[in-house]
């Protein structure tokens, strides 16, 4: 019985791990280009970059690949409140200190999102809804 349960766990976990390995790892420039080409659809991938800035927002957090989050070259990571408990447990309450200046690797879907009240201005973002999407910080 235990062996059967163990095999069942392996069968469930193995496809998820291999699917992660099959995803490309994109730089911010590659992510922005692919999101623009696929818009309005999103692109699932791994993303890796050095965090240049971070800010709290409405119970969540934003991480940016550029110091100026308005930059067209910026890849933003929108961390939703649902991910905050797991992230603060793992990295502490001061996420800004935990991430800024460090290289992060995460899994998710990148897309162009309309920002501002007038529309016509877009940002490229990856949404993090659970802490497990952030795979490494170094």
Identify what each model region corresponds to.
Residues 20-138:
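OB-fold single-stranded nucleic acid-binding module
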Residues 1-5:
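Positively charged n-region of N-terminal signal peptides that target proteins for export
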Residues 13-16:
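N-terminal signal peptide c-region/cleavage motif recognized by signal peptidases
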């Amino acid at each position: 019985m235990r062996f059967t349960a163990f095999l069942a766990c392996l069968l469930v976990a193995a496809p998820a791990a291999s699917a992660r390995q099959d995803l490309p790892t994109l730089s911010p420039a590659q992510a922005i280009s692919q999101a623009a080409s696929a818009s309005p659809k999103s692109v699932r991938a791994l993303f890796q970059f050095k965090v240049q800035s971070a800010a709290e927002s409405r119970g969540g957090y934003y991480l940016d690949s550029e110091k100026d989050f308005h930059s067209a070259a910026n890849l933003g990571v929108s961390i939703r409140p649902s991910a905050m408990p797991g992230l603060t447990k793992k990295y502490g309450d001061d996420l800004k200190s935990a991430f800024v200046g460090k290289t992060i690797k995460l899994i998710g879907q990148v897309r162009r999102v309309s920002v501002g009240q007038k529309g016509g201005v877009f940002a490229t973002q990856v949404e993090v809804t659970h802490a497990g999407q952030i795979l490494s910080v170094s």
